[in-house]
A protein has these predicted regions:
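Nucleotide/phosphate-binding catalytic cleft detector across ATP-hydrolyzing
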Residues: 1-166, 183
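Short, intrinsically disordered, charge-balanced linker/junction segments flanking boundaries
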Residues: 164-174
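Single conserved hydrophobic/aromatic residue that forms the stacking wall/gate
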Residues: 172-175, 179-183
Length: 183
């Protein structure tokens, strides 16, 4: 059983790390998966409660999938989906306020060409105050680590039998060190 850094106030005691996989079909965290569909409204949705409220706009999440975009930073879609992913993982951990280091991946082919832009996109605001499913979240984004896709997912696992061993043999991770993120 993994122990999380909690306090009774629903605020994390110290930094927490949250990994997000920004897929076109789904956003994935260590404990949650949801579809990437996103629709923006000026008024609170009547039917759905599965929305992010951010800067006086309402973004209904997860009712479809996004289409492929060669550059995920051209719209605010993945930024809003990141907020939903942060909220999902924080809710799982019993938190509503935290200092967060965000760990994300990029396809290997995009690492050199898009890492700096992805960093600027996700770190454009360090103090986040938003609601998800009518619950308020406050996040101090104190860091961002970018890894080649697949690396962050493998790093946390103790043993991974089967085909996943191919990934491990390519990157050779040994504890207690961890791979260096891409600058």
């Amino acid at each position: 059983m993994q122990k999380f850094n909690y306090q009774k106030s629903n605020k994390a005691a110290g930094k927490i790390y949250i990994g997000l996989d920004h897929g076109y079909g789904n956003i994935k965290t260590a404990h949650r998966v949801f579809q990437t569909g996103i629709e923006c409204y000026d008024e609170e949705p009547i039917v759905s409660t599965n929305y992010v409220k951010y800067r006086d706009k309402y973004y209904v999440i997860g009712e479809s999938h996004l289409v492929y975009q060669g550059n995920k930073t051209e719209t605010d879609d993945f930024y809003i989906l990141t907020l939903a992913g942060l909220a999902e993982e924080m809710k799982y951990r019993g938190l509503h306020e935290a200092d967060v280091v965000l760990a994300v991946g990029l396809p290997l082919a995009w690492v050199k060409t898009q890492a700096a832009e992805w960093r600027n996109y996700l770190m454009r605001e360090k103090e986040l105050d938003f609601s998800f499913r009518k619950e308020r979240y406050k996040v101090h984004l104190c860091g961002l680590e970018i890894f080649p896709q697949g690396l962050a997912a493998v790093h946390n696992q103790g043993s991974m039998p089967g085909m996943n061993m191919l990934v491990l043999s390519l990157i050779h991770i040994s504890e207690p060190t961890r791979p260096e993120p891409i600058s």
